[in-house]
UniProtKB/Swiss-Prot annotation:
Acts as a ribosome collision sensor. Detects stalled/collided disomes (pairs of ribosomes where the leading ribosome is stalled and a second ribosome has collided with it) and endonucleolytically cleaves mRNA at the 5' boundary of the stalled ribosome. Stalled/collided disomes form a new interface (primarily via the 30S subunits) that binds SmrB. Cleaved mRNA becomes available for tmRNA ligation, leading to ribosomal subunit dissociation and rescue of stalled ribosomes. The lineage of its organism: Bacteria, Pseudomonadati, Pseudomonadota, Gammaproteobacteria, Enterobacterales. Belongs to the SmrB family. This is Ribosome rescue factor SmrB. It comes from Salmonella typhimurium (strain LT2 / SGSC1412 / ATCC 700720). Associates with collided ribosomes, but not with correctly translating polysomes. The gene is smrB. NCBIfam families: PRK04946.1.
Length: 183
């Protein structure tokens, strides 16, 4: 095995002789503070609050009037119907996907609220919600919930590449991003 030092015996002896009487320096100039847990808890708490706020709009008792013939679709009154046509043609490609398979109605509402909050926070305009076929509970409820939310501009049955009739493409109203003003 090769030794780690490349110094000769003389150099090592000289070094030891010069180091006689020295002691290790105690590091006392920099105080290391422990990491605070509050820093990581605040964003988590804020995210949970955003989800709760966003899912507040979803009611099982209110039934918005949606067209029951043809593919599932909805457009808010102040939004052009041309947006539905663009969604149907596949002009929009979703940046976020939400899979509701296996969730309860309560969990699905919370996840929908979280999706809408995340889209607004990240300035994402189009998302895909996959409700699946299943027992048709989430398939029937998801459009009713989405139509109640004020930040949902429109939704349409997804094109085949995004899930077809087991998914919805959703357009979310996002605030325009403004760069910070310089002083």
């Amino acid at each position: 095995m090769k030794k780690k030092t490349s110094l000769s015996e003389e150099d090592q002896a000289l070094f030891r002789q010069l180091m006689v009487g020295t002691r290790k320096i105690k590091q006392d100039t920099i105080v290391h503070r422990p990491l605070r847990k509050k820093i990581t808890e605040v964003p988590t708490r804020r995210l949970i609050q955003e989800q709760a706020d966003a899912s507040h709009y979803f009611s099982d008792e209110f039934q918005p009037l949606l067209n029951t013939e043809g593919p599932v679709k909805y457009v808010r009154e102040d939004v052009s119907h041309f947006e539905l046509k663009k969604m149907r043609r596949g002009d929009y490609s979703p940046e976020l996907f939400l899979d509701l398979h296996g969730l309860t109605q309560l969990q699905a509402k919370q996840e929908l609220g979280a999706l809408i909050a995340a889209c607004r926070r990240e300035h994402i305009f189009c998302a895909c919600v996959m409700h699946g076929h299943g027992k048709h509970i989430l398939k029937q409820q998801t459009p009713l919930w989405l139509a109640q939310h004020p930040h949902v501009m429109a939704f349409h049955q997804a094109p085949k590449e995004y899930g077809g009739d087991a998914a919805l493409l959703v357009l979310i109203e996002v605030e325009e991003w403004q760069p910070p003003e310089l002083p």
